[in-house]
Amino acid sequence: MIHCSMAHSGAMAGLAAGLADMLSMTAFDLPGHGRSGDWDGSVPLQRQTVDMALDFLDGPTDLIGHSFGGTVALRLACERPDLVRSLTLIEPVFFAAAYADHPGLLEQHGAEMGAVADAIEAGDRETAARLFLREWGNGMRWADLPEQMRQKAMEQIHLITAAHDEIGLDSAGVLSSGAVDRLKVPTLMIAGANSPHYVEKINTALARRIDGAISEVIDGAGHMVAISHAPQVAAVMRPFLAAQG
């Protein structure tokens, strides 16, 4: 299980509980998150996270990823399909897929994330984190978030823009190489009905390319669906996982 940015492996506990009778699960902390060391920039962030995930795999595995974790799971499946029995992508923020089908989105999203990047560059991490979470957070106003959560978001906000080339520009060639189109792993795509409009376009773009991919939408949920609506996510995952034997 690969969690989203600005969280930690424990964020997947609710979803894990809903699948505990079906799977034996392992979750790890992304670089710069939880108990993992800081990301030092020597290796691209997504590449480093894929390599971390690979260290846990010794055979075909049911891979589950949320948000940035979903992009990691997708890349791993494309690189090592022999190690993936099934793939569950919950709101994978692989913007490059949406840009490929909707070129105008690149400029729109670039302007939005440009404001975040500009704030980071100016040393204003609070503004950067506030702007980012306004679109991609749990729906709470910045001022209403617990102080500890706001502080952690400010500490980690640079990791959001650090992955830009891999998830936005497809610098690893996951899409442009045709690896996504060749993927034959059973795949389930999950989105929240109230998520940013990019998510539906990303999921649709990926589902169109991955043979046999199944798409599900969770009513009343936003981008944090894997956390906020864990029982509902588990409920749609269970028949998919059962079908894998």
PLM regions and their residue ranges:
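Conserved HGGG/HGGXW glycine-rich cap/lid loop of the alpha/beta-hydrolase fold
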Residues: 1-38, 59
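The conserved beta1-alpha1 loop
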Residues: 2-4, 66, 191
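Conserved acidic catalytic loop of the alpha/beta-hydrolase fold
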Residues: 47-62
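Gly/Ala-rich beta-loop-alpha elbow adjacent to hydrolase catalytic centers
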Residues: 65, 69, 73
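Flexible "cap/lid" loop of the alpha/beta hydrolase fold
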Residues: 78, 83-120
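Conserved alpha/beta-hydrolase catalytic His-Asp/Glu region
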Residues: 122-162
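Conserved serine/cysteine hydrolase catalytic core
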Residues: 152-208, 217
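Catalytic histidine-centered segment of alpha/beta-hydrolase-like enzymes
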Residues: 218-234
